[in-house]
């Protein structure tokens, strides 16, 4: 009875233990990785502790692409619907509008940590150590040891006086090919060898091609100054140089002695110079200034000078008498301006007369001012002696003193101002009067 009860319980236990191995429990992959170090396949350090300590974290900045939503678009989608009932029927086609977002490619900067070799180590597993002070000292010790061994080997191979140049007989044949490598030294069991004596020097070889030009050497020091040589013979006379610039004007010399008295000359019949003076406006009724000539009698010595240039043209002559009346002309056209003008308004002729009268007043004032200015200029010219070359004797000759002693100022009658009238032109009042007479 107990056996019957225990048998089903034992079967359940055995079946449960057998089926338990078939279940799979998912574990996260991060739980299986070693925390603190990356995987081996992704360039991470190995499992050994010596390789792990050569890996370090490095901050890396990367630019990665990503999709960013950029608006939306409307799409028309076709939808097919099958028959919902049994039997022959046509498929139904419908359309619907969808609004879906659009994306564009953008770039952003990502900062991440990567496992890389620590400073001073290289290689795929960061096992190779870069050159540093420790390795340099180790290499120096190894080099010193090798140099000491080379010195010991050179001291051990002292040449002994051989009886002949042949090598000693060997009990065992060498393991290398003597003909192929005559000067090779075996690594194991080298055996004693004797150095052969040095042979005679061979003939000199042919001269090789010239080598490339070397770089220029540094500039040498400046040599000592040589002794001064003898003076050479004088050279040939050179060509004359160009003419120099004119020098500055010298100071005027002292006045010379007075010359001898000349023979008395003939008195001239005509006056030698005329000086003009202005009268007061009270002498005339209209207030115009009047020129009064002052005749100066001079007594000069010497021959007369050359003939002067011709003078300016004279003033225009007086207005001639009016001619005989002409034949009556044909009847002229009617002036539209006169016909169309209403009564009481001034005609064009009257307006022109008024404008010319106003203009004549300004011109008359200007003529008066120019007349006075011309009189003053003429007086100054006669005082200086511009129009009379004999009236300005050379200074220092003694004639200027005689001229000043013999000058006599005389006032005469009025002289017509024909020259001034020629310079100033016709009077605008007279001109307007002449024009009115011509029109009549």
UniProtKB/Swiss-Prot annotation:
Enumerate the InterPro entries for this protein.
Collagen (IPR008160), Collagen/C1q_domain (IPR050392), EMI_domain (IPR011489)
Q: Which Pfam families match?
A: Collagen, EMI
One Gene Ontology cellular component term attached to this UniProt record is: collagen trimer
Where does the record say this protein resides? Secreted, Extracellular space, Extracellular matrix
Q: How is it modified after translation?
A: Hydroxylated on proline residues. N-glycosylated.
Q: What is its main location?
A: secreted
Q: Which residues form the Collagen-like domain?
A: 199-267, 302-334
Q: Where is this region: Disordered?
A: 157-362, 390-440
Q: Where is the EMI domain?
A: 52-128
Residues carrying sugar:
70, 132
GO biological-process terms attached to the record: positive regulation of cell-substrate adhesion
Matching PANTHER family, A to Z?
COLLAGEN ALPHA-1(XXVI) CHAIN, EMILIN ELASTIN MICROFIBRIL INTERFACE-LOCATED PROTEIN ELASTIN MICROFIBRIL INTERFACER
Which protein, by its recorded name, is this?
A: Collagen alpha-1(XXVI) chain
Q: Report the source organism.
A: Mus musculus
Give me the gene this protein comes from: Col26a1
């Amino acid at each position: 009875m107990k056996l019957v009860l225990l048998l089903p319980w034992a079967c359940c236990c055995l079946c449960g233990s057998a089926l338990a191995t078939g279940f799979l429990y998912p574990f996260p992959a991060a739980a299986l990785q070693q925390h603190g170090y990356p995987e081996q396949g992704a360039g991470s350090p190995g499992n050994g502790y010596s390789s792990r300590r050569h890996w370090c974290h490095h901050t890396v900045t990367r630019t990665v692409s990503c999709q960013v939503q950029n608006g939306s678009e409307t799409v028309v989608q076709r939808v097919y619907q099958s028959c919902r009932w049994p039997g022959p029927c046509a498929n139904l086609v419908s359309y619907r509008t969808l609004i879906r977002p659009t994306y564009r490619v953008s770039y952003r900067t990502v900062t991440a940590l990567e496992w890389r070799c620590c400073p001073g180590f290289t290689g795929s597993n960061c096992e190779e150590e870069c050159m540093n002070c420790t390795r340099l000292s180790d290499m120096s010790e190894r080099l010193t040891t090798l140099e000491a061994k080379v010195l010991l080997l050179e001291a051990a191979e002292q040449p002994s006086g051989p009886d002949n140049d042949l090598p000693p007989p060997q009990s065992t044949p060498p393991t290398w090919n003597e003909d192929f490598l005559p000067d090779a030294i075996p690594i194991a069991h080298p055996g004693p060898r004797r150095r052969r004596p040095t042979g005679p020097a061979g003939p000199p070889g042919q001269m090789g091609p010239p080598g490339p030009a070397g770089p220029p050497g540094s500039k040498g020091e400046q040599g000592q100054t040589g002794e001064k040589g003898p003076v050479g013979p004088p050279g040939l006379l050179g060509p004359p140089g160009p003419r120099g610039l004119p020098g500055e004007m010298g100071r005027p010399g002292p006045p010379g002695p007075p010359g001898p008295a000349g023979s008395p000359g003939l008195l001239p019949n005509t006056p030698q110079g005329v000086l003009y003076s202005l009268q007061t406006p009270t002498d005339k009724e209209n207030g115009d200034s009047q020129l009064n000539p002052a005749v100066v009698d001079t007594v000069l010595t010497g021959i007369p000078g050359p003939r002067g240039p011709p003078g300016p043209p004279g003033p225009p002559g007086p207005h001639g008498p009016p001619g005989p009346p002409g034949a009556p002309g044909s009847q002229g056209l009617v002036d539209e301006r006169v016909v169309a003008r209403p009564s009481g308004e001034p005609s064009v002729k009257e307006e022109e007369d008024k404008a010319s009268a106003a203009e004549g007043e300004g011109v008359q004032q200007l003529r008066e001012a120019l007349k006075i200015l011309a009189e003053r200029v003429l007086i100054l010219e006669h005082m200086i002696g511009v129009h009379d070359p004999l009236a300005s004797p050379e200074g220092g000759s003694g004639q200027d003193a005689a001229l000043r002693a013999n000058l006599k100022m005389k006032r005469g009658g009025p002289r017509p101002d024909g020259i001034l009238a020629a310079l100033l032109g016709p009077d605008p009042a007279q001109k307007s009067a002449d024009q009115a007479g011509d029109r009549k």
